[in-house]
Structures are given as structure tokens and as C-alpha cells.
Amino acid sequence: TFGVDSGKWYWEARVVSGQHSFIGINGYDTKTTADRGGETAQDAMIRQNTGNLRTNGGDSSYGSSYSDGDILGFALDMDNGKFYVAKNNTWFNSGNPANGTNPGKTCLTRRTLAACAPYDNKSFHYNFGQDDTFRGAESSAGNSDSKGRGVFKYAPPSGFLAMCSKNLPDPTVPKGDE
């Protein structure tokens, strides 16, 4: 994936085998390991066996645990520094990314990317809009973002876009003499 420092982004991940794993976001320059997910202020990782949110190296109550086959939704609002997580289309902590209420994490200030820390060969299948069947494990739902991009199991929150290169702004490249 790639890191983002502005915009509102949505992606999903299906838990293939996630016992004791972490999944969420990391700062662009953060190293994550299975036993140390969410170690800095920029990071926010959901712990599989508890549903707690780990940030700054400590856990706080946030959501419910997830199991194999669950689909996690992630909404990252870099414009307002907020991060949300859903399980099977229900946002943890009664969060509402479209309205900006009850995020799991606030104060995101630097380039951030989707991340996971699988433990003991556990795995997730990510969907950044490329495959809402998660390699044929789910039936297609055909939800896309407001620009008609991506295909997701669950509808992205209003104002959030698929985290794909087509949704990135065009770069401004100065002329050679500037």
C-alpha cells in the first residue's frame, strides 16, 4: 500500500486466520511486530482476541474481538485526524465516520498507511477496492465509493474514497527551470 497525509479513505480486510494478531494503521516510519502493534502515538491497531485498540503501547476498550471470516472496515480521515473501525458493517464505539463522531483514534498528524501484524503465520485478505469477494470467499456486493471507484463488501461511509491510486490527487510537477 501507500501512505496518505490528507483525504478520507476506506478499505476492508477479511480475517483469514487472525488469532492474537493486530490490524489497523501505522505511521509511515513505524515498525510493527505481532507482539508490539500500535506502539507510537500515530499508530492504532485492533487486537484480535480482545477488540481493544492499542496505541502508544497500551490497550483501551474500543470494540469487540474479531474471528476468522469477519470483515473489518477501516475509515481513515486524515483531514480531521480520525480513524474508525467496523466489524461486519457495524462501527465500533457507535462511531460514524460520515459525521465525524466517536472515532477510535484522533490526532493523526503524519503520513499513515494501512498495516497489520499477523502472529504465527496468521493472515488477512485486504480489499482496497479491487475484490469484494476476498478471493472468492464472499459473494460480491458491488459497493463503490462516491466516484464509482472500487468494489467493496460494505458501502464506504459518505465522503470516503477507495484507497487506490486513481483517487490520489494529480501531483504538481514544477518545470525544469522553476
In which residue ranges do the predicted regions lie?
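PRY/SPRY (B30.2) beta-sandwich protein-interaction domains
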Residues: T1-E178
